[in-house]
Amino acid sequence: MESSRLFTLGLGNSDDGLKSTFGDKTVTCFYCNKKKEKIRDGTSTWTCSICEATNHIDEKGDILDYRPPTPTQDKGVGPFYAIRDFPSSSSFQSPFCEKCQMNQLIVNRMLADYLPDSSHPDYQAYEKALPEYKKSIEEKFPIVCSECYDSVQDQLDANDYEAKNQVLGYWLQKSKEQLNAKVPHHYPKASFVLWLLRGFGFSFFYLQSIVWHLYHSMIISLLPDGIRNLFLKAISYFLLDGSSSKIFYFNWLGFFVVFWNPYWYKMMDNPSWELFGRDQYIQCQALYLIIRLTCLYLLSCYESEILNLSSDTNLESDFLLRQIHAAFFFVTICFTWISISCLKPSPPPEVHLTGEILKPRKKRQESTSSVHRIGKESSDRKDGISGQNKLQQFATISILNNTNATSHLGNQSVRERAPEESPMTFLQKKMAALPTSSPVRPMLKPTLQLQNSPLSKLVPQEVGNKVNDSIHTTSNQPSKFSLNPSISLKGDNVIEKNLPFSVSTLKSTAKKDTGKAGDGQNREIQNEPVSLESHFSKSLALQNDPTEVIQVKNVLHRNRRNAKLLIAFTILFLVGLICGWRLNRFTMFIYYLCILVLATYYVMKHNFYPLRKVA
């Protein structure tokens, strides 16, 4: 009876499976250090609820470096049972051959050993040259050969198909739900009525501003008598006979209506639509309202002085005032058009199932500088060393997880369907595409020398000595070991580029092939470096841009030219108006400002449209 009470109160033995309310302690996970758990005394193992890591502690509560013991095999032979074999996830067949895996291992090791410590004085120079260095070693050691290209591409296509299948299924399900569901009107009637009233106030505000400036400007005198009589009849509706001081106080009401959204009703009926340009619309409205209030305040203060100035200069009493109203008439129209055109409602993207015919895939040509051809090429030389056997000594680990390689191929497989071209061929095409007016200099034959290459850490000592001395190849073959060497172009202007392998500028000249095989002297042969195209691109201002970007740049150039022509013709037109209407400098400045705003809007609108289309 007494023992049952103890068990009921939770004071019994903890080994009987009953949780005790006493003896609990709070511990912190050793791995995430964020979650505190309550465990009972005597517990040596517990699992964190956040990171799901298993913590092992000793009797004092200190963390233990726990390693599960290896299971011991029983000496006795137990009964044998037939067990069905299930395919494991680790039985994935890699689409890469041993050659690709070895190249991937070389690339990964060279990239890992490239950057020095952050405390190194030339760390920024190394980091800046990292993209060129990575590109050069990927050209020397291609991570995907021509034999594996099809299988890797098929695997990527299968992955893309699965991803597209999931995305397409989601869009189809979502579009089906949108078609079947009825979109309710979430806004009350009071909001709709208020939106209509603000729209009426917005229209009346801008219409009154435009008509008021038109009525008091010199343009009204050029209109026919019938239209002039219509303006006289509309005086009582648009406050056309009001002075500048009255209109100034009236324009303060514009803060309640100028920020009206004309697409609010459409966006509420179509929740899936998006409205772009809302911020630019509000900024343009606020800027116009501030400019208008400032100008009206100045007109109301100095209206009498302007009239006196007109009489002193033997002009009509209100001639200057009419010019100012004419200028603000065009400015108001300009700001109204620009502000409303900033708003762009955009429907959701549509999904169409179209039968697209893919072009036949071409095999990518294998680079002649592959690691497996080094031995074959160097064996033809009398003083060459078999690079294949040397490089295979440190490439013994096979890459099973090819995430870097597959991601690299996934980024370039879409663009590089065509066979690869040599750097010089690609450079010649770019130079042929340059305009005739561009200051293109004839290509000079550079000379190169390599010192302290990071490849020397991986290549055996015998090959490394050859690399550090001077390694040159023929002009028809890319350099095997010289990755991003320092280049000095000798001509009218000397261009020196310091690259990370030797921070100081390396200057060397090509020597004639005077050595013989086995005489202990290093042979130096003139060559064209691997990264020659990139260095000529910098000196000639060439850019490796895709076709879409080049088209966009052409559109930008054309629009800027048209805008300049528009401004020039408009200025000539205003110069002609000076002789006829005797415009003063202030009115001329207002007209020019209005034209400049229109031209800027034209350029910005037509420039960003192709950029959004390409993106």
Curated annotation (Swiss-Prot):
One of its GO terms (biological process) is nuclear inner membrane organization. The keyword Membrane applies. It is found in: Nucleus inner membrane. The chain crosses the membrane at residues 192-212, 247-267, 323-343, 563-583, 586-606. Keywords: Membrane, Nucleus, Transmembrane, Transmembrane helix. It is a multi-pass membrane protein. InterPro entries: Ima1 (IPR042321), Ima1_N (IPR018617). Residues 374-384 have a biased composition (Basic and acidic residues). The keyword Electron transport does not apply. One of its GO terms (cellular component) is chromosome, centromeric core domain. Its main location: nucleus. Residues 357-387 are annotated as: Disordered. Inner nuclear membrane protein that specifically binds to heterochromatic regions and promotes the tethering of centromeric DNA to the SUN-KASH complex. Couples centromeres to the nuclear envelope, thus contributing to their association with the microtubule organizing center attachment site and to the positioning of the nucleus at the cell center by microtubules. This is Integral inner nuclear membrane protein ima1. It comes from Schizosaccharomyces pombe (strain 972 / ATCC 24843). The gene is IMA1.
